Structures are given as C-alpha cells and as structure tokens.
Swiss-Prot record:
It comes from Heliobacterium mobile. Its EC number is 6.3.4.19. PANTHER family: TRNA(ILE)-LYSIDINE SYNTHASE-RELATED. It catalyses: cytidine(34) in tRNA(Ile2) + L-lysine + ATP = lysidine(34) in tRNA(Ile2) + AMP + diphosphate + H(+). Ligates lysine onto the cytidine present at position 34 of the AUA codon-specific tRNA(Ile) that contains the anticodon CAU, in an ATP-dependent manner. Cytidine is converted to lysidine, thus changing the amino acid specificity of the tRNA from methionine to isoleucine. Belongs to the tRNA(Ile)-lysidine synthase family. This is tRNA(Ile)-lysidine synthase.
Amino acid sequence: MNHLLQRFSQSLCRLGINKPRERIVIALSGGADSVCLLLLFKKVSPQFGIELAAAHYNHGMRGKESDEDAAFVAELTNRLQVPLFLETAPLKWWQQEPGTKMEAARRLRYDFLSRSAEQAGARWIALAHHADDMAETVLFHMLRGSGIKGLSGIPAKRGPFVRPLLPFRRKELEEFLKAEGQHWRHDSSNDSDVYTRNRIRHQIMPALLSFNPKLVETLCRNADLLRADAEFLDRECELVYGQVQQEEGLKVQALVDLPLALRRRVLRRFLEPENPGSEKTDAILEQLQKNFGRSKIVDQVGGKYLINEGGILRSYEELPWLENQDFFYPIAIPKEKNHSVRLEVPEAEGSLEVTLSTKKPVSLMHDEGPPSKPMKTALQLKAEVLQRGPLSIRNRRPGDWLSLAGRAGRKKLKEFFIDKKIPRQLRDRIPLLTSGEEVLWVIGCWTGCHDTIDQPGQDVITFQWYGKTI
C-alpha cells in the first residue's frame, strides 16, 4: 500500500498539485473509484498541505438506490471529517434538458462540481477516472471512427479538472479499499449491456485481453503518444492560422497548400463552435481544391453557408441576396457647397453621403487593376457628370456597362463581375453608382468613370459609402 501511496503522490506532482494549502474538491459518487480517490487524498493531505472537500450530485435516476448512494457519501465524509457539497436534482429534470438523458446528466453534474469548487474556493476538481476507463474510452472512440483527439482518450488535466488515478488499474484500487476495510457502493446500471460502454467493458475488453494481456497499458500508452501529437498539431494550427486568415475569412489557396493535417485543423478552427466531423471537413476541403479559383457556395455547416468569394472562404448565417431584392434610389445633390446629404440603402446594409465642394481632391487611379483603398469606399467626380443625366444608387440591371478608363470601349458589368471573380450570389446585392445604364462606380470594387479631376477650383461631388462592402 505504501507503494500505491507513493505513486499517487507522484501523480499529484506531475499534475502540479503540490502547493501548500491547495484546495481540492473531489467528485464523490460513492463507487469504488471515487471512494479510493478520497481515501488516497486524505492520506497524503498532511504531506502536501491539501485542504479537501467532496461533492455529490444525486440525479435520482435509480430511485431508492440513488438516495442510498447520497446517504453513504454523507456518512463517509462525516466520518473522515471532509466537508461535503450535496445537491439533489429536481424531479423529472431530464424533461427540461436538451440532448440525451446521459448527456444532460453529465452536464448537470459538471455544472454542480464547478459551482461547488467556486463556493469552496478550490482551484482543482478531482475526478476518479483510471487506466481501465482510459482504455475503454479509446476503444469507444475507435468504434465510432473518431480522429486523433478521440483516440487520445481522457486528458489528465483540462481546465480545473484533474484525474490523478489515470496511472492506476481498477483492480488495484479495489484491492486498496479491501485492505483498508472500506466498503463502496455498486451502481447497478453498470451491469446492463444496454449501454455501449458496458458492452465494451463486459464483452469486447475480455476478448481482446485474451490476445494481449497488457492491452490496457498498450491503449493508454498509445493515447499518450497521440495526445502529444495532437497538442503539437494544435499549436502549429494556431501559428499558421494567422497566415491563412484574411479579414473574416480564409485564403483558399493558402489553405489548400497546407499539409492535410493542418488543413483540416485550420478549417475546423474557422468553423468553431460548429464541429462538422471528419467526413464533412474532408468534403469541404475537396470542394475547395476543385474550385479554389471559382466563386460559389461550397457547403452548409450548422445552419451557416460557406462561400468561396473569389478565393476567400467566408461563413454567413443567412444569404439575403438569394431573395434577389431589387433597389433603386435617386441621388439628390446638395444645392449649397460644402453641405452633405445622406441616403440610406438598407438592401445593401449601408448609406451613401454626397457632398458638393470646390476643394481640389487627391488624384484617383482609374485602371482595371486592384483598386486603391480610397476607391473602395469613397469617390470624387467632376460636377459635370450631372450633365449626363440623373444619378442613382441601385443594384445591377440587364444591359449595365462601365467605361474602360484609359482605353477605348466599354465592358459589360456581367463580364466585370466574372473577371473579378465576384460570386454570382453576391452580385445582386452590390450597390452601384449609375447614370442611366452606365456604371460610374461599383461600390467596394472599382470605378469605371473617365471624369478625373485635374483643375483646381472645379466643382466636385464627393461620394462616401458607409457600410458593408464585398
């Protein structure tokens, strides 16, 4: 038994639970594992200066048996002089909780443990999972087709939750309790093979142990190796994420150039808190690789639309442009100079401010290359543009065209959108500054107007866009 206590002390040190006056709450169900955890902590607490408390949540799922568990825990902690936090779930609590009954029970239990630790001023919450639990968990995830994280099993430490018994087998914990003359409660639900975990414990594990008597140790060791790999890849993912990210999206070319392991992690990181699963993740990546230079809706994840917008992957909760809402607003030019009027354009989620002045502006570039930053949200034109006809802000119409600055001819707006790889789904939503069928400014993208301002003192009209751009 001294050897077991020594190993337990070493486990606490590895977890960093070795500071004087450390406060710990022990999750105490009354089963052999948690009772053993409590007794081990009680024995080493003088050595470490640990202050203990226990917490028991009575779900009432097994009726009288659950109440007897709570009574047993209360008697045990009273005898050991360990403070106890005890809470009983309301009747038929599972009817108000989302998810399966088992998921809801786990959620309520962990919430109670967190509240108990806060009330006790405890830094740590100790759980009684051991090596056999680890092996069964790895097999469970393997049967479900989980990836590297699932096959990493149960972490020894996650947030405030610690598991000091992971290096120990179930059998040696029970032998310790017998040597101490300490009884424990038996959970009858563990006898039923209705639950997958119980079938793994009762049927699959014994069969596999006949092939490899050291199977539990093997699975635990493999889980440790995989967890180290997963942690390394997660760190690498965080390092490259900033390189792949652009504004609120991901650069598709940079994403598909990553090694597959990082590609998957970066995409899942982008989709958080949604968890699309490995098959969905790979399907999205396959679509991006096939069409990384094209604009299209890639997929839908958790109610969100993934769209490749000309090489940038973005996520949208809704696609209002699919409703194809036409809009048209005549633009009123201020009658007095240095005054502004503002026009709201709700369909494009923005507004246009129009100012008449004689101030000499900074020259603007007019080419078909990437626009300079000011041209995305601001434009200045000679007031002579009004001679062409009334100005308006609207979305696209059949027959729209724009002038090719610096060269003869025109270009259809449709061809411009194709050349700029602007997604078809977005084109009806983009606001345009127009004069008849001529597009003077594709707001957020480009201007096709020849009216550069080259003389001081000219009357000019300044257009400033406030709101979303593509």
